[in-house]
A protein has these predicted regions:
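Charged, glycine-rich active-site and insertion segments that engage polyanionic ligands
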Residues: 1-60, 74-77, 109, 145-147, ...
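Conserved alpha-helical scaffold flanking the Walker A/P-loop in AAA+ ATPase domains
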Residues: 23-32, 98-119, 127, 131-139
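Short loop/turn elements that form and flank the Walker-type P-loop nucleotide-binding site
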Residues: 36-37, 79-83, 113-116, 130, ...
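Residues immediately within or flanking Cys/His clusters that coordinate Zn2+
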Residues: 40, 66-69
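AAA+/P-loop NTPase substrate/partner-engagement loops
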Residues: 68-98, 158-159
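Structural recognition of the conserved hydrophobic beta-strand(s) that form the central parallel beta-sheet
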Residues: 120-123, 136, 147-153
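Conserved Walker B
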Residues: 124-128, 156
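Flexible loop/N-cap segments at domain edges
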Residues: 317
Length: 402
């Protein structure tokens, strides 16, 4: 078990090394040592490793006189997104454009109102467009004295080179299953056995593990995905399963956005001065249209995220199948705590049936098809077409190409 982190760092599972770097930076004086504070950071790591949590914790520590106690008003408001000198940038769109970046640059140049720094956290810095990066570059090259930029992305290569070359880099590791399970037990009160199962299924993704541990519907959806490879017998099965997966993703996204959409619409109507008589101000139609466009983009992204989770589960499933076929995992190792083992040890029977009914070459081709499906979703290909093509490929038919 890893050492338990405290204060604002408490939720950064398995990131002791990275937290050490951030702590030393908050406690150092500019220019005094190799641990000196930098005005621009690029925090990278695999999905679910806690990039945005690390950035928010760092932002809180920078505002705290005790360097991240986790108890003071500065820490609490920074972590919750309510601190006036910490700007948290999340996007539902596929990119962060130049206009949004220019507004961030303008805000970053302001003096802190209450805090010690003006901190800007960009959770999806890999989505900044080339023109947006040009607008950001000057602000990073010539920062205001108390401004700190915290950019988050999966890898340094995902960020435009002119930006990443001017940032101090910090990489987060994939948390070990034991560390994730310990967090679920300690913080969320999950039963140890369920926490261990969810942590393994989450494959180092803390948010996914928490969802599986706390949401019975999420576990049921995962079980249904685990049954999928053994029940695709015909073209009709593939088409029906693809439709079901897309519909389920749409319903999941709609449920997640319904309340937020309604609140945003009510807030905008109030701001525009909608009267009780139903009369609409002259500029209302354009403003409402813009809001609907933003909400539609968010809905599509959440649907895509839901399908991406399906693809992640299918990748892990066929990784296990390949491990069985090649002898990389022996029967006595399938449920080991670490090392060579099956991610989905609870599905061992089904995995062995699939392994026996297909060749390793077919399994590799299936994994390639899953990766191609993920890339197609990223490019905006119609989700139903993507899933139909993938499931047909999984049955052993000729692989279609997008």
């Amino acid at each position: 078990m890893s050492d338990v982190l405290t204060g604002v760092w408490a939720d950064l599972v398995g990131q002791e090394k990275a937290v050490g770097v951030l702590r030393r930076a908050t406690e150092s004086q500019p220019g005094r040592s190799s641990h000196a504070m930098s005005h621009a950071w690029l925090i990278t790591g695999p999905p679910g490793s806690g990039r945005s949590n690390a950035a928010k914790a760092f932002a809180a520590a920078l505002q705290c006189v005790d360097h991240g106690c986790g108890q003071c008003n500065a820490c609490r408001t920074a972590l919750s997104g309510a601190h006036p000198d910490v700007t948290l940038v999340r996007t539902e769109a596929l990119s962060i454009g130049v206009d949004e970046v220019r507004e961030l640059v303008r805000r970053a140049a302001m003096n802190p109102v209450h805090g010690r720094h003006q901190v800007v956290v960009v959770e999806d810095a890999d989505r900044i467009t080339e023109r947006g990066a040009d607008a950001l570059l000057k602000a990073i090259e010539e920062p205001a004295p108390k401004t700190v930029w915290l950019l988050c992305a999966p890898t340094p290569e995902d960020v435009i080179v002119t930006i990443r070359s001017r940032c101090r880099r910090l990489h987060l590791a994939t948390p070990r299953d034991e560390a994730v399970a310990d967090l679920l037990v300690r913080r969320d009160g999950i039963a140890p056995e369920l926490a261990a199962e969810a942590a393994r299924a989450g494959q180092g993704h803390i948010g996914r593990a928490r969802r599986l541990a706390s949401d019975q519907e999420a576990r049921a959806r995962r079980s249904a995905i685990g049954e999928l490879p053994t029940r695709l017998r015909s073209l009709g099965d593939c088409l029906q399963a693809a439709e079901d997966l897309v519909n389920q993703a749409s319903e999941e996204a709609a449920a997640a956005t319904a309340q937020v959409d309604s609140a945003e619409r009510a807030e905008l109507e109030k701001a525009l001065g909608f009267g009780s008589s139903g009369a609409r101000p002259r500029n209302a139609q354009a403003a409402m249209r813009d809001l609907e466009k933003q909400q539609s983009a968010r809905l599509k992204r959440l649907q895509r995220d839901a399908l991406d989770r399906v693809l992640t589960e299918l990748t892990a499933y066929h990784r296990d199948v390949l491990a069985i076929q090649t002898g990389a995992v022996r029967p006595e190792e399938e449920n080991a705590l670490r090392g060579a083992r099956l991610v989905n040890a609870g599905w061992s029977g089904a995995l062995h049936r699939v392994a026996d009914s297909h060749s390793p070459e077919h399994t590799v081709a299936t994994i390639d098809a899953i990766l191609a499906a993920r890339n197609s979703l990223e490019r905006g290909v119609t989700p139903l077409l993507v899933m139909e093509t993938l499931l047909i490929a999984m049955t052993g038919a000729d692989h279609a190409r997008w």
